[in-house]
Amino acid sequence: MIETSDFITPESEEELFERIEPLQANGITSLSYLVVREGKQFFMKQLRPEHKDNPRYILIFKKEFAIGQRISHPNIVDYKEIGENSEGIYILTEYVTGETVEEKLANDPDYFRNNINLDNFFRQLLDALGCLHSHNIVYCDLKPANIMLTRINNNVKIIDLGFCDTDDYAFSAGMSENYAAPEQLQKASNKLDTRTDIYALGRLLQHIEKRRGRRLPSK
């Protein structure tokens, strides 16, 4: 569990960051920024002003960072630090330059039509999920928007661990309906396990194959 003493609390944002640039990748409860410190870029996720004093959302942020700190894998975004400034709690992760899977499908429709690219994508994704599962973490929100392909080499990066389910933080698991397993749709959080992610992986494959002009069996 993260205690208050673990937070970085500068007197002002200017003392910590050289540049803060808003991004469009905002969530329902959070805002996103590209920040620069000592010449290096980071992704900053911060609670929206209307939620910054909400104990539940603060705990969810702490949960996300605690999970991120447990994981070290080349295909999962690297969590750097958690802190607090005049706008409230924030999380810093590595800044990934590239595209989400959904953006890749739209901007480069031939990419996944190449079987080597497709195989490489799913091998890396499975390896990343295997790492999470080996730490008793269920990702719970596998979808095209939460998977990036890096600009160089198109390496997989799973981003946003905010909806992960663990034994310690099971109450805050989330989902995206189009990729949610039946137990998620039924709000049966006590039934979530690694198979929940495998179901979403199948839905993701189905989505990509459809965009490739192919169809997988529905059953």
Regions picked out by a protein language model, each given a short descriptive name:
Residues 121-122:
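Activation segment signature within eukaryotic-like protein kinase domains
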Residues 51-70:
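AlphaC helix of the eukaryotic protein kinase fold
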Residues 133-149:
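Catalytic-loop of the protein kinase fold
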Residues 171-184:
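Conserved activation segment of eukaryotic-like protein kinases, specifically the C-terminal portion
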Residues 101-112:
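AlphaC helix of the protein kinase catalytic domain
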Residues 86-100:
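Conserved short submotifs of the Hanks-type protein kinase catalytic core
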Residues 82:
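Activation-segment/catalytic-loop signature of the eukaryotic protein kinase fold
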Residues 197:
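Conserved catalytic-loop aspartate of Hanks-type protein kinases
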